[in-house]
Amino acid sequence: MIGRLKGILIEKQPPYLLLDVNGVGYELQAPMTTFYRLPSLGHEVVLHTHLSITENLHQLFGFAEQRDRSLFRTLIKVNGVGPKLAVAILSGMESDDIARCVRDNNIKALTRVPGIGQKTAERLVIELRDRLKNWDLPQGDMLAHGEIQAIASDNDIYAEAESALIALGYKPVDAAKMVASAAKQKPEARSEELIRIALRSLAGV
């Protein structure tokens, strides 16, 4: 079982990243909340990992924080929630925000994540309520994301942001609208920050 990787970040195109660990390249999938915390290319990073093994597929997922990995592992135990949807959920809001939605029975916020309908959101709240009852929540409202790192050139900022949103499950036309709206709010934003703004606007936080 691979539980932690320390290496040089050599590629990142949400939701995928590539880590060079002693000459071996590890491809991982990660939620946007992890991408927000990544250093620029060529720098060292430590990621907490989860290896998902099925009959035909081995997937490695990376997380900047142990609590994000912990919540990911809790999410995939919910009936109907696989790794892809768990990544989408963790991309839409911080772990503490998800726990807060469960605590407050905030179905509406959860349904804004692509792939989560009313029934799935209700199931998440029901099944996670006991599992997250000891989650240490900070005081206050929905959390703000951390500092954002720039990853794209000026020519492909919008394209990268749209591609990332599409990979998270949004339709191309919706992704384009979300990026355009985010760009109006902050014209100088880089791709990762555009994604952050778009996702937070959709979640209403």
UniProtKB/Swiss-Prot annotation:
Stretch list, region Flexible linker: 144-153
Region of interest called Domain III, as start-end residue ranges on this chain: 153-205
Renumbered residue ranges of the record's region Domain II: 65-143
First-listed, main subcellular location of the protein, grouped into a coarse class: cytoplasm
GO cellular component, one term: Holliday junction resolvase complex
Keyword flag Calcium: no
Subcellular location(s) per record: Cytoplasm
Family of this protein: Belongs to the RuvA family.
Name under which the protein is recorded: Holliday junction branch migration complex subunit RuvA
Organism: Cellvibrio japonicus (strain Ueda107)
Lineage of the species this protein comes from: Bacteria, Pseudomonadati, Pseudomonadota, Gammaproteobacteria, Cellvibrionales
Gene that this polypeptide is encoded by: ruvA
